[in-house]
């Protein structure tokens, strides 16, 4: 039986069809918003997975290019691995849903979002979050708290829910808010230096609209939701928990109160060895339970320390940032480098400048086709002192890279101001909390060192949260380190300039944040951000005046757009010859702007520009040109005065004396001065060597 329910969001129809597709899935829905359609399938394994200590939730976001009427590029002509954007959208779906599953739930759960049709006014990723929540709520999987999501824009001082393409072009804020009917669960934001008060208001504005979508989901569940399965929840054996905790609590507490991380970890290893010696034989089949008890005991001690004793593991005040150091220019051959260290977190970012032709080409369902500025993030095993195989970037690396990229994007100069492609690579050298925000700081240093004229320096900070079980008591923490992130309830990342916020990402391990917590986190992040910006400015107060001598050089010339075809030539013959002869890269824009770039060959740039100017320059009657003889006939000589532009010097115009034979005066290949005496209606150019000589003699006499 097919069930249908509709509502209206921001003046557009949102509709769900349940039972129409995916008959063998636990729950399968067709969710539409305008002409955007996403199919969501939710399934779970019948039994918990053994031998794991985490919840195995898998969220997939599958883009189909047919959804926008495109055929994939390349030879294979089908969708390949997920794009970076697909991975980011999958992470955005995962983060608000994961905390709402029952604690101890170990069944495999998979949510597959397939984008089937896209109307660019209605973002499929927002629809997918709502659809994933609704599919889970309608299923028999033990998920009972609906989550809703909206996009919020800010145009001309007005907040807009789910802005259209035209509105997104003018918005200074790109905000996604996910919430239950009671609390905010997740926020993603990019903005053009938005002040804290405005950002808070925008989040609350989105929160209110989320409540309406939650009500829609609740109505759907009441009308056609399945009966929920009774979950089998993992819990450590009570006897094991009692004995291990009794034996080890004081030892673990003593270790957890050691401020130095290395010393603390070393002491914990010793405690774990003692626990193993004491219980390995008695509970040889309960190793996982023992590990769970140790983890829960550590968590209890750290949370009590923060919440009730007003003490942090490293002794800092709750609003104190770890010691900071900044360096630039540490790699001699790169275009710009920044080394940012905050406590035991250290990131080195390297900036590379390229020609505009080095942009990243995007083949996705969005309208955006290329990226001129990009940021990549690497997190090797040595950054946490571990040994594991080095692989390509995972979802976490892609997510952190995009977060730092978004933080700096509003500050990057326009193409006309700075005609270069910019790539930043952040290498995490040491990790003890908030490497993504350290990447923002390292990237700022690298850009300034590279001479990129960014609007203002940016910095990032991660705020944390500890709450009581009943959520009544809470404490916000500035600049969380690894242990506070691991045992805490929130990771609230805020990046921006002294003027305002450019990026936010926060998610939580609990059932959402209170409004006061959101406000306190924003204010605390501002204070910390200004402190860090001061340290950055002490190191390098402004962009370097000159680019690195190893960076490419780009010159811009403007031509009449009607002349572009003359520069390109038939089949690209002309432009390819210029590139081959001068060893440069050339980018031509539709408005007639031409960008000429060369690596360490300034003469090549000058030569290429000279050729292009010659190709596009108009011949002026009465002007004198230095031309080259290309052909001789019995009636005169043809002379090329500009690239591709020839004129005729009649035999009578070659010299003052009578000329019997053209070759007596000029030969093919000779360079001679000629004057343009006439351009006829057909564009034919008449030249005179005699008049050019006379004019030069006249100028000499003066």
Curated annotation (Swiss-Prot):
Q: Name one GO cellular component term.
A: cytosol
Cystine pairs annotated here are none
What organism is recorded for this protein? Answer: Clostridium botulinum (strain Loch Maree / Type A3)
Q: What is this protein called?
A: Polyribonucleotide nucleotidyltransferase
Swiss-Prot/TrEMBL keywords: Cytoplasm, Magnesium, Metal-binding, Nucleotidyltransferase, RNA-binding, Transferase
Q: Which GO terms describe its biological process?
A: mRNA catabolic process; RNA processing
Domain S1 motif, residue spans: 622-690
Matching entries from PROSITE patterns are given as: KH_TYPE_1, S1
Q: Which domain of life is it from?
A: Bacteria
Which of the seven top EC classes does this enzyme belong to? transferase
Binding residues for Mg(2+), per the UniProt record?
485, 491
